[in-house]
Amino acid sequence: KDRPRWMAQNAQAFFATHLGNQVSSELIAWTVQRCLDCSAKAAVEVVETGFSTDLRKEAGALQVPTLILHGDADASAPLHLTGRRLAQLVPDNVYKEYPGAGHGIFLTHTEQLNQDLHDFIEGSSS
C-alpha cells in the first residue's frame, strides 16, 4: 500500500544503524529514492528471482579466485542462510564476515571493504 514508507522504515535495518553504523539522513534518503526509482514489478522480480533460483551447482563449480564478504547483521540476506552457505559451496574462497554490518555494507563499511577488495586483487594477481 505504501511502498515509500516501507522502504524508509526498512532503511534502518539495511544499514544496521541500530548497531551504531553512522549513516547520514541524506544517504538514507538517497538510497530509498534509488529503490523507489525502479518499478515495483522489477523490485518484486529481483526478490523472487533471488529466492527461487538455485545456484548451488554453479557456485560449487567456480574455479576462479572468489572473495565473499558478508555483514553479520544483514537482515535482508541472513548470514547463516546466505554468506556462510555460499562459503561452504565455493571452492578455495576467501570469506570475511563484517561485525555489525547490514546489507548496505558497501556504504557503511566502505574503507574496510575497499581494503579487502584491494588485498584480494593484489593477492590473486600474483
Task: Name each region found by the language model.
Residues 2, 68-71, 113:
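Generic structural signal for small/hydrophobic residues in well-ordered secondary structure
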Residues 90-126:
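Catalytic active-site module of serine/aspartate enzymes centered on a nucleophile-bearing elbow/loop
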Residues 57, 84-85, 111:
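Active-site phosphate/pyrophosphate- and oxyanion-stabilizing loops and adjacent acidic/basic residues
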Residues 38, 77, 108:
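Residue-level signal for the nucleotide or nucleotide-sugar donor/cofactor binding architecture
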Residues 3-60:
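Conserved alpha/beta-hydrolase catalytic His-Asp/Glu region
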